[in-house]
């Protein structure tokens, strides 16, 4: 059996990589992918603690996070496609200048 520490270290590494992508990258698609990576790190943490405790609450929480991530991805990609069609670019600087 793999200790929970390994799962938590992997989740922390995934979350840090996602946070780095959100803070550093300028492309909206890469930022969305980084947010998804952070959500997957949270899922890994939920499932690891559920396995340690022996209950299903972590699995249910992970399914809920997956549903929220799917909705976020669908809405986010629709916004990115609309911005690309109107501006021709998906850089975050272009999104900041959309004030009318």
Curated annotation (Swiss-Prot):
Gene Ontology annotations of biological process type: ATP synthesis coupled electron transport
Subcellular locations according to the entry: Cell inner membrane
Entry EC number(s): 7.1.1.-
Recorded superkingdom: Bacteria
Name of this protein: NADH-quinone oxidoreductase subunit K
HAMAP family to which the protein is assigned, alphabetical: NDH1_NuoK
GO cellular component: NADH dehydrogenase complex; plasma membrane
Membrane topology: Multi-pass membrane protein
Quaternary structure, from the entry: NDH-1 is composed of 14 different subunits. Subunits NuoA, H, J, K, L, M, N constitute the membrane sector of the complex.
Transmembrane residue ranges: 4-24, 29-49, 63-83
Lineage of source species: Bacteria, Pseudomonadati, Myxococcota, Myxococcia, Myxococcales
Reactions catalysed: a quinone + NADH + 5 H(+)(in) = a quinol + NAD(+) + 4 H(+)(out)
Gene that specifies this protein: nuoK
InterPro entries per the UniProt record, alphabetical: NADH_UbQ_OxRdtase_chain4L/K, NUOK/Mnh_C1-like
Keywords of the record: Cell inner membrane, Cell membrane, Membrane, NAD, Quinone, Translocase, Transmembrane, Transmembrane helix, Transport, Ubiquinone
Family indicated by similarity: Belongs to the complex I subunit 4L family.
PANTHER family the record matches: NADH DEHYDROGENASE SUBUNIT 4L-RELATED, NADH-UBIQUINONE OXIDOREDUCTASE SUBUNIT ND4L
Role, per record: NDH-1 shuttles electrons from NADH, via FMN and iron-sulfur (Fe-S) centers, to quinones in the respiratory chain. The immediate electron acceptor for the enzyme in this species is believed to be ubiquinone. Couples the redox reaction to proton translocation (for every two electrons transferred, four hydrogen ions are translocated across the cytoplasmic membrane), and thus conserves the redox energy in a proton gradient.
UniProt xrefs under Pfam families: Oxidored_q2
GO molecular function ontology, one term from the record: NADH:ubiquinone reductase (non-electrogenic) activity
């Amino acid at each position: 059996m793999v200790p929970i520490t390994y799962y938590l270290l992997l989740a922390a590494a995934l979350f840090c990589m996602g946070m780095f992508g959100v803070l550093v990258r300028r492309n909206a698609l890469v930022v969305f992918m980084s947010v998804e990576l952070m959500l997957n790190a949270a899922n890994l943490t939920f499932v690891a603690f559920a396995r340690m405790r022996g209950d299903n609450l972590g699995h249910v929480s992970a399914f809920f996070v997956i549903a929220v991530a799917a909705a976020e991805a669908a809405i986010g990609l629709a916004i990115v496609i609309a911005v690309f069609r109107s501006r021709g670019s998906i850089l975050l600087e272009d999104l900041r200048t959309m004030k009318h």
